[in-house]
Structures are given as structure tokens and as C-alpha cells.
């Protein structure tokens, strides 16, 4: 069985509490490096999870790490630029949402992935939620006609999350 070498770009709270712990459960994947513009944060995450390599520079990370697949969990503001660098380096990419700031930027990422013959994927957002799947089924079966507008509010049902964080929010 092939073991995929994973690189994580962005070592904030979501990486620490969701992505990295979940990746550790996947038998055919191993995180080989992490990268964050905050070098101390990258080092802390690497030490916490026993990851051998950490970087504070995306270009060095892409040139030196053995990552075949990169998970872009970087800040929303810089994510498009990070994603373009990952794709241009010929690495497969899984990006946190939103993967691009606008349609034009998304199109550039898609076209670059095609030229480099790599897979570009992004977080599924809400499409796998049961209520969304049911709505898709009902629309597909013609049960509710042809929708012209869909409005949805989603909450997590608890206290405001960010004020209770106990890790670096970057």
C-alpha cells in the first residue's frame, strides 16, 4: 500500500485541532512536514505531533520537503497565493475553504492544476450535510419545482467559538 507524504501549510487552530489529528488516523498517509509563516508556531506543531520537518518559508518548504500532497490551511487572505505556489511546484493540493477569493482566481488555480497534472480539491463546505443532500435529492426529483433562490443559515448551537480558543488563532 502506498503511503502518501503530506505537507501541511498553515499551523493555526484548525490545523492543530482538526486536520492534523484526523490525518494521523489515515493509514496510507503520513505528515512529513509543516509550514507556517510563524516559525515558532510551525516548530510547536511539529514537536507536538512528532513531525520531522518544519518551515517558515513556503518556497523552502516546497523545494525541500518530500510532500506529495499539500494541505493548504493558511490564512484566507494569503491562501490563493499559497495554493498557486503549491500547484506550480507540481504538488497535489487539498485546500481549506475558500480556496480562492473570486471566480477568476479559482479559474487560475484550476487551469494551473491541469497544466501541472495534479489534483486540486477543496473542503466540501456544506455539500455533505444531510439536509443539503436531501434538498439536492428533492430538487433533482422535481419535488419542489425549480428554485430561484436558496437562503440558508447555519449555526453550531453553542457559545461564540473564538472567544474560548486556547490556541494561536493565526
Positions of predicted regions on the chain:
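Receiver (REC) domain switch-region micro-motif
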Residues: 34, 70, 150
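Predominantly a Rossmann-like dinucleotide-binding segment in NAD(P)-dependent oxidoreductases
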Residues: 126-170
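Rossmann-fold dehydrogenase core element
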Residues: 108-125, 145-149
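Hydrophobic residues in well-ordered beta-strands that form the structural core
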Residues: 15, 55, 95, 120-122, ...
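N-terminal Rossmann-like dinucleotide-binding module
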Residues: 1-49
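Beta-loop-alpha module in the N-terminal Rossmann-like domain of NAD(P)-dependent dehydrogenases
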Residues: 49-112
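Rossmann-like NAD(P)(H) cofactor-binding subdomain of soluble oxidoreductases
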Residues: 78, 98-100, 121-128, 133
Amino acid at each position: 500500500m502506498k503511503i502518501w507524504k503530506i505537507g501541511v501549510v498553515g499551523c493555526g487552530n484548525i490545523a492543530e485541532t482538526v486536520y492534523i489529528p484526523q490525518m494521523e488516523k489515515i493509514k496510507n498517509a503520513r505528515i512529513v512536514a509543516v509550514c507556517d509563516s510563524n516559525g515558532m508556531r510551525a516548530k510547536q506543531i511539529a514537536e507536538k505531533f512528532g513531525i520531522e520537518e518544519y518551515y517558515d518559508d513556503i518556497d523552502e518548504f516546497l523545494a525541500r520537503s518530500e510532500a506529495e500532497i499539500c494541505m493548504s490551511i493558511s490564512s484566507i487572505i494569503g491562501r490563493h497565493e499559497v495554493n498557486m505556489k503549491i500547484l506550480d511546484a507540481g504538488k497535489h493540493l487539498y485546500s481549506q475553504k475558500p480556496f480562492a477569493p473570486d471566480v477568476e482566481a479559482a479559474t487560475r488555480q484550476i487551469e494551473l492544476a491541469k497544466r501541472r497534472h495534479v489534483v486540486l480539491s477543496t473542503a466540501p463546505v456544506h455539500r455533505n450535510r444531510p439536509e443539503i443532500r436531501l434538498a439536492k435529492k428533492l430538487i433533482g426529483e422535481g419535488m419542489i419545482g425549480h428554485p430561484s433562490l436558496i437562503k440558508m443559515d447555519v449555526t453550531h448551537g453553542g457559545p461564540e467559538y473564538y472567544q474560548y480558543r486556547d490556541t494561536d488563532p493565526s
